[in-house]
């Protein structure tokens, strides 16, 4: 199944999986202790990973068609907080994730996508350091007690 494409106008189009459902993120409801890894620098040929712990508390909203989580961590000795609001559109069968954090204190462009079984893929077209990019959020809930989230960034060629 094709998840997304960039059309002739340069717009991102995302396609829902037939099995996409408002219950796709139910596995994430509750309190989590998370072990994270991130690259020290993005899009700079960096291969140095930084590891850190965080907590996450996720609750249902809007009769199960949305959820919200609060992410808390410490980076370089400073407290860091983030919130994600996830909304499911029953007409399009697409999820939209809106993220804000204590660094930017504003919402990022929404990630949009769906789950196909245990695998969720959500996409966003954005700009990073003046370069147009596509961001992929990849969720794997195959092991419901240890779900895995990862992020990939691809630079769009002009």
For the regions a protein language model found, what residue spans apply to each?
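Amphipathic/hydrophobic helical signal segments and adjacent flexible N-terminal regions
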Residues: 1-49, 57
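Short beta-strand segments and strand-loop junctions that repeat across beta-rich extracellular domains
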Residues: 25-28, 34-44, 88-90, 146-158
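N-terminal leader/targeting helix
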Residues: 45-79
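Hydrophobic/aromatic beta-strand elements that line small-molecule binding cavities or substrate pockets
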Residues: 53-59, 73, 82-87, 109-113, ...
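Residue-level recognition of beta-strand termini and adjacent short loop/turns
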Residues: 62-63, 143-145
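Short beta-strand segments that buttress and anchor functional surface loops
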Residues: 69-74, 97-100, 122-127, 151-153
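Helix-adjacent hinge/juxtasegments
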Residues: 73-109
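An exposed acidic His-Trp-rich patch
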Residues: 102-128
């Amino acid at each position: 199944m094709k998840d997304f494409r960039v059309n002739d106008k340069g717009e991102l189009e995302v396609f829902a999986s037939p099995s996409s459902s408002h219950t796709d993120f139910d596995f994430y409801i509750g309190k989590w202790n998370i072990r994270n890894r991130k690259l020290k620098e993005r899009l700079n040929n960096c291969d140095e990973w930084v590891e850190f712990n965080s907590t996450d508390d996720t609750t249902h909203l809007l009769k199960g068609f949305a959820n919200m989580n609060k992410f808390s961590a410490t980076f370089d000795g400073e407290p860091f907080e983030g919130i994600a609001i996830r909304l499911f559109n029953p007409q399009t069968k697409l999820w939209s994730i809106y993220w804000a954090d204590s660094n930017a204190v504003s919402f990022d462009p929404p990630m949009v996508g769906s789950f196909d079984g245990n695998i969720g893929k959500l996409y966003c077209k954005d700009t990073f350091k003046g370069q147009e990019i596509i961001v992929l959020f990849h969720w794997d809930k195959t092991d419901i007690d240890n779900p895995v989230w990862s992020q990939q960034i691809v630079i769009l060629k002009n």
